[in-house]
């Protein structure tokens, strides 16, 4: 009996070759293990995008994974650039591979922000390959003698030719030519299969991807498609039969694999951040002191759980010099040479040459920060916690990580940028006293182990939110400070979803554009294609039974879902390393100018325990910053009890204001951070928040974890005294007491597993990671035996054990960290306080911070008007570029004590460039405009922009009637090239019919997205048939199950994954918001109307639960009388 030869596949592409491979990396590794290959080399085109995913699967399978890439190389062979597979033999070779891939994308000698290239233009010159050949093995799938000779000169014995047999015409001649060149030049020849799929069944999808890549269809692709399915993974036996005339080719492949000993595990946890160094004496004022110190609040309010709202600190009299990065000038990007020491040794650096670095610096900053936070020496329990955390940070070597985040936060505050740390970092007392986070974890009783632990063996993760409009300043600071070769943003892999998959597959299969559009419109962006059945196809005029291509489109689109389409930028993850980052992971330009990204996403980095810093943008911080700035300029009278003494610091907002909680309790929360959704508004009257911790609960409870775990209703019943507080296991009471026996937070789930099931902290954290990982229900269910056995040992069995497991299983959706909820609750309170006491400034700030939040500008304006704010429209004579506050006199700032009026800014005019708006403001600064002609002449307005302003009703007193203004604007003619100096000779007066109120409102919405004249529903209500159709306000007075009809403008549509197909629609009318509940059967009957109509007429019954009122819908129809506003709903899936 003969044995199959050893064989390793050395040339394999995955779907991360972007439209060149039709299998996931995990599928290729799994199949290679099944086939008994001795090793597998993943060599995607110009990238290492999928290598970490393959590595994780290879570890599970016990299969050696060779790291490689297939580079497009210019100048290797005559004619067009050639393909060359490079395989890493050792760590040096891996670094060289990463550098070459980076060079291919970024070009030669890049130091600034390189320009992004199209994928087919990415290439590297052979001279660069030859110069970086050390530690790399080159595999050339060609036979050109000159190219082979050049490879041998550059790589020596680390070069080979690759041959393949795919049963196509002409390939035997290429195989013979390669073998001949190999013999002549002394270069080995290895058998490969140029793998594109893990199974032959994927060949149809491979053809589709080829068509997408070339912008053609399967009917027209011709020779661009592979003629068969032979480019799939094959086992040693099959290849031995195929290459029975050349067994040494298989042996050569196995030998090459044996030479490539580098594994991705070698870079696990590698590359600490560069140490931050501060000169002695520079710490005076180095930890910025808040205008209102948290210690003051502590002395006044003693040991309460309510944190200070300290997000922005005032600056010292003189801004301290920026700390240096070890090994470089403070102002330059230079860093220590590659190979400089790191790890715990670098992190524990001590004083030298009069400077502080590493743990010495961190300890000093913590001492200063603790005195700042607590107004002197910290309480004993805080001091103990700080000592414990510092000891662990030192032992794990993470001092530079904390110092780097501190440095970035320090920079932001020096520029007046509002910021706050959140997530698990809020569990850390060190982060709190460094000013990174705003939650006192000792007072809140938060679990430090959720953030970092010795047993877990993974790096900490600090997330910091910055004003989203100013985050770019922070990002560019990081690039400038550390250098682009040592800092890069984490990528996000944008994958095919339902619509995008349908569109690309449909086009490739030759469906008409009309068919593709109708098919794609059937589903939401994230909807499961498996739900597309005959009824939906019939709605689109498509019949799967009669169209084989429609059936294939659906089937192939389902296969394509989850494949990568392109890379985007992660919301804020930064990788910063001491040695060049491009020796650890390739870097490439992002689509956004000025940014570079690494080729791995956050999960890849986590798999390898590589540190990242998350610098995130948060719209609410922008809005809060803008609101405080408005208050600083338009401060109320000093006697006002709601005046902000120091409007540049949230720390000065009065805490625990009953009026704020009362407002939130009646669901008056449009625009308020995190609690403005329909679900949160439904919760608020039942929760009735009375203190800060109630806001923490509110933030966390409307999440998939608590919802799927069935925890919301038990908590509310216990809170109302309708259900007895009970604990399935008595020792759990200290863990669950604050949430009335119901686990709501990840930290509680971890403690529960330790106490009730005997898990170690490390096992509990593994449980936490399983619970919060997508699609992890199966993994969590597999742990049930371990959980149940541990609970049984402690006398927990039967119903109690099932209850605990059910609650834990709910967290597989998404359990919220308590620290994260507490950080967000700070912003809930701050935004609610501003809405309650300064609604004009708050609404103005929200308008100026768009896009953000849950509602479109027109809803924010309507809400402001319901709160007594006067809103004035866009006017070239009064408006700034942004919305602003003015007094009773149009265009004049509000005087102290005067009620502020909200003036909509020129930015609201759709399509108007900022440069045009600023030209108007610059001209107006010299004096008011006396006429339209003067406006045109002084602001150098073109006819197009003047017409745009006239259509928006923005010419104000210059032309009060909109139609007349448009007519006159069309008469503007050019004078002297691009200077539009005035009006044409007068034409006969034209008597234009007056616009109706409905026409005016429609024009407002069409041009600015909002109207200050009135709500569209107020205009059409008289034609709706008397009192039959109720207003949103009237719904609150109707009894439960009363039949009702409501109508309104659709402002939000939601179809949450946790709602089992239920759709929630919010309708706005002139009195408020009505919430519709559309059950799945009703949704299927009225899908096009629900998804597409801007105004709805809904019939159904009132559903009351306490003060919460919804309408359960029986039928819906478009509102025929509604004006054509062009208003856009915010749709969330």
Swiss-Prot record:
Family: Belongs to the DNA polymerase type-C family. DnaE2 subfamily.
Gene source species: Anaeromyxobacter sp. (strain K)
Stated role: DNA polymerase involved in damage-induced mutagenesis and translesion synthesis (TLS). It is not the major replicative DNA polymerase.
Listed EC numbers: 2.7.7.7
Protein name: Error-prone DNA polymerase
InterPro entries according to UniProt: DNA_pol3_alpha_NTPase_dom (IPR011708), DNA_pol3_alpha_thumb_dom (IPR041931), DNA_pol3_finger (IPR040982), DnaE2 (IPR023073), DnaE2/DnaE/PolC (IPR004805), DNAPol_HHH (IPR029460), NA-bd_OB_tRNA (IPR004365), PHP_dom (IPR004013)
Compartments reported by the entry: Cytoplasm
Reactions performed catalytically: DNA(n) + a 2'-deoxyribonucleoside 5'-triphosphate = DNA(n+1) + diphosphate
GO cellular component term of the entry, any: cytoplasm
One BP annotation, GO: DNA repair
NCBIfam families per record: polc, PRK05672.1
């Amino acid at each position: 009996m003969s044995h199959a030869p050893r064989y390793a596949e050395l040339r394999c592409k995955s779907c991360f070759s972007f439209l060149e491979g039709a299998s996931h990396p995990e599928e290729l590794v799994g199949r290679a293990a099944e086939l008994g290959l001795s090793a597998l080399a993943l060599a995607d085109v110009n990238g290492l995008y999928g290598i970490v995913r393959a590595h994780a699967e290879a570890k599970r399978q016990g299969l050696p994974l060779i790291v490689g890439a297939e580079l497009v190389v210019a100048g290797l062979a005559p004619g067009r650039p050639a393909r060359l597979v490079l395989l890493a033999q050792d760590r040096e070779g891996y670094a060289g591979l990463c550098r070459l891939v980076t060079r291919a994308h970024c070009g030669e000698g890049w130091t600034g922000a390189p320009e992004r290239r199209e994928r087919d233009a990415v290439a590297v010159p052979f001279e660069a390959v030859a110069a970086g050949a050390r530690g790399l093995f080159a595999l050339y799938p060609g036979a050109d003698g000159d190219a082979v000779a050049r490879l041998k000169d550059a790589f020596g014995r680390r070069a080979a030719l690759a041959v393949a047999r795919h049963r196509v015409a002409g390939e035997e001649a290429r195989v013979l030519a390669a073998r001949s060149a190999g013999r002549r030049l002394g270069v080995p020849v290895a058998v490969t299969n140029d793998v594109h799929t893990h199974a032959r069944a994927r060949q149809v999808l491979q053809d589709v991807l080829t068509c997408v890549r070339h912008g053609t269809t399967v009917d027209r692709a011709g020779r661009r498609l592979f003629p068969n399915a032979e480019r799939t993974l094959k086992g040693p036996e099959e290849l031995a039969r195929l290459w029975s005339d050349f067994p040494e080719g298989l042996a050569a492949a196995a030998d090459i694999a044996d030479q490539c000993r580098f594994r991705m595990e070698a870079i696990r946890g590698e590359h600490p951040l560069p140490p931050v160094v501060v000169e002695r004496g520079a710490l005076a004022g180095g930890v910025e002191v808040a205008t209102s110190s948290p210690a003051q609040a502590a002395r006044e309010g003693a040991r309460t759980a309510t944190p200070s709202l300290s997000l922005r600190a005032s600056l010292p009299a003189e801004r301290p010099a920026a700390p240096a990065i070890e090994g470089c000038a403070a102002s330059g990007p230079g860093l220590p040479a590659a190979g400089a020491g790191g790890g715990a040794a670098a992190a524990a650096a001590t004083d030298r040459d009069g400077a502080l670095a590493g743990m010495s610096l961190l300890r000093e900053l913590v001492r200063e920060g603790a005195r700042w936070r607590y107004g002197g020496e910290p309480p004993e329990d805080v001091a103990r916690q700080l000592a414990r955390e510092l000891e662990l940070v030192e032992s794990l070597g993470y001092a530079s990580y904390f110092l780097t985040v501190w440095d970035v936060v320090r920079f932001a505050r020096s520029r007046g940028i509002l910021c706050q740390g959140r997530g698990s970092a809020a569990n850390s007392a060190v982060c709190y006293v460094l000013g990174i986070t705003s939650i006192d974890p000792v007072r809140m009783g938060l679990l430090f182990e959720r953030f970092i632990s010795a047993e877990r063996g993974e790096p900490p993760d600090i997330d910091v939110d910055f004003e989203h409009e100013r985050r770019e300043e922070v990002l560019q600071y990081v690039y400038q400070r550390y250098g682009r070769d040592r800092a890069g943003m984490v990528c996000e892999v944008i994958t095919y979803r339902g619509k995008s998959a349908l569109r690309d597959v449909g086009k490739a299969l030759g469906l008409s554009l009309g068919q593709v559009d109708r098919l794609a419109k059937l589903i939401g962006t994230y909807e499961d294609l498996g739900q597309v059945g005959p009824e939906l196809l019939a709605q689109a005029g498509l019949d799967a039974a009669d169209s084989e291509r429609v059936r294939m489109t659906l089937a192939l689109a389902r296969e394509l879902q989850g494949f990568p389409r392109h890379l985007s930028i992660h919301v804020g993850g930064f990788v910063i390393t001491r040695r060049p980052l491009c020796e650890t992971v390739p870097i490439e330009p992002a689509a956004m100018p000025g940014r570079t990204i690494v080729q791995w996403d956050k999960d890849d980095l986590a798999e390898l325990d590589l540190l990242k810093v998350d610098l995130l943008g948060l719209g609410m911080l922008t809005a809060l910053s803008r609101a405080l700035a408005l208050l600083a300029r338009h401060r109320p009278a000093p006697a006002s009890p709601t005046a902000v003494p120091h409007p540049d610091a949230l720390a000065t907002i009065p805490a625990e204001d009953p009026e704020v909680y009362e407002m939130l309790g009646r669901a008056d929360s449009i625009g308020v951070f995190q609690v403005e959704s329909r679900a949160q508004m439904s919760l608020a009257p039942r929760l009735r928040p009375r203190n800060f911790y109630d806001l923490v609960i509110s933030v966390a409870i409307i999440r998939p974890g608590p919802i799927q775990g069935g925890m919301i209703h038990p908590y509310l019943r216990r809170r109302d005294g309708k259900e007895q507080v009970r604990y399935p296991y008595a020792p759990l009471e200290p863990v669950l007491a604050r949430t009335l026996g119901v686990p709501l937070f990840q930290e509680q789930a971890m403690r529960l597993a330790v106490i009730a099931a005997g898990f170690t902290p490390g096992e509990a954290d593994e449980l936490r990671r399983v619970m919060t990982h997508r699609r992890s229900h199966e993994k969590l269910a597999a742990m049930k035996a371990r959980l149940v056995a541990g609970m049984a040992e402690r006398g927990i069995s039967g119903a109690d054990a099932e209850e605990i497991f059910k609650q834990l299983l709910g967290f597989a959706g998404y359990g919220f960290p308590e620290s994260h909820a507490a950080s967000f609750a700070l912003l809930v309170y701050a935004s609610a306080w501003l809405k309650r006491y300064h609604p004009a400034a708050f609404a103005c700030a929200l308008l100026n911070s768009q896009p953000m939040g849950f509602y479109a500008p027109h809803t924010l304006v309507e809400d402001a008007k319901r709160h007594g704010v006067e809103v004035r429209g866009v006017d070239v004579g009064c408006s700034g570029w942004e919305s602003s506050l003015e007094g009773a006199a149009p265009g004049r700032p509000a005087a102290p004590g005067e009620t502020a009026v909200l003036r909509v800014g020129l930015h609201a005019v759709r399509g108007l460039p900022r440069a045009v708006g600023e030209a108007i403001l610059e001209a107006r600064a010299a004096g008011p405009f006396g006429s339209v002609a003067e406006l045109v002449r002084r602001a150098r307005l073109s006819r197009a922009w003047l017409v745009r302003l006239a259509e928006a009703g923005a010419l104000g007193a210059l032309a009060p009637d909109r139609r007349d203004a448009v007519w006159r604007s069309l008469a503007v003619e050019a004078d002297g090239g691009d200077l539009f100096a005035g009006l044409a000779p007068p034409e006969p007066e034209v008597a234009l019919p007056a616009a109706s109120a409905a026409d005016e409102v429609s024009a407002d919405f069409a041009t600015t997205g909002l109207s200050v004249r009135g709500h569209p529903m107020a205009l059409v209500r008289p034609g709706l048939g008397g009192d039959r159709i109720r207003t949103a306000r009237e719904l609150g007075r109707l009894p439960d199950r009363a039949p009702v009809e409501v109508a309104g403008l659709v402002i939000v549509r939601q179809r949450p994954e946790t709602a089992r197909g239920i759709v929630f629609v919010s309708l706005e009318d002139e009195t408020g918001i009505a919430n519709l509940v559309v059950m799945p059967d009703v949704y299927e009957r009225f899908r096009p109307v629900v998804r597409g109509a801007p105004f709805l007429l809904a019939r159904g019954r009132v559903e009351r639960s306490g003060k919460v009122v919804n309408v359960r819908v029986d039928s819906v129809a478009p509102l025929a009388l509604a004006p054509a506003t062009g208003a856009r709903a915010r749709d969330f899936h």
